[in-house]
């Protein structure tokens, strides 16, 4: 399994629409950087957020998630409350090749401010926006800047194709758009 370089990422984005929209340059002046890098792609966070709240005194249950757990927010800057959590989504829409797995790591700019980003792997055959989990681990409110970088995606190509892709197994988050809340197949 090999880590893919910028030339491969560029080709897959431009010729196979693996990343749309695709930013061929790495933009970093005056913003949290985003776009193509040497061995990855820095994704941007969109303007929509779902901020966890205790206003309704609910319990977070991944098997029975209720919308009252979150407050919808749209804007250029999202303030994540102290010791809190928000969901967001990428601006980019991904179409993963059948022999490629992508992993996502938070950007150091945010990590050094106590902002931890979690994204599960993009499985072979997955298509959709990426839902991003953002934790503010500090005792202070923290800003997240929409339309700027939030994490870096690394692409790993397998030595052979898998028997069953995410698309083949009809994954529960396949072709998701916007922010997708937890789902349990029934």
Swiss-Prot record:
Gene3D superfamilies attached to this UniProt entry: 2.70.40.10
Enzyme Commission number(s) of this protein: 3.5.4.13
Catalytic activity from the UniProt record: dCTP + H2O + H(+) = dUTP + NH4(+)
Keywords: Hydrolase, Nucleotide metabolism, Nucleotide-binding
GO BP terms, alphabetized: dUMP biosynthetic process; dUTP biosynthetic process; nucleobase-containing small molecule interconversion
Pathway it works in: Pyrimidine metabolism; dUMP biosynthesis; dUMP from dCTP (dUTP route): step 1/2
Domain of life: Bacteria
Annotated residues for binding of dCTP: 107-112, 152, 166, 176
Xref: InterPro entries: dCTP_deaminase, dUTPase-like_sf, dUTPase_trimeric
Subunit structure comment from the entry: Homotrimer.
Similarity comment: Belongs to the dCTP deaminase family.
Function as written in the Swiss-Prot or TrEMBL entry: Catalyzes the deamination of dCTP to dUTP.
Annotated protein name in UniProt: dCTP deaminase
Organism annotation: Campylobacter jejuni (strain RM1221)
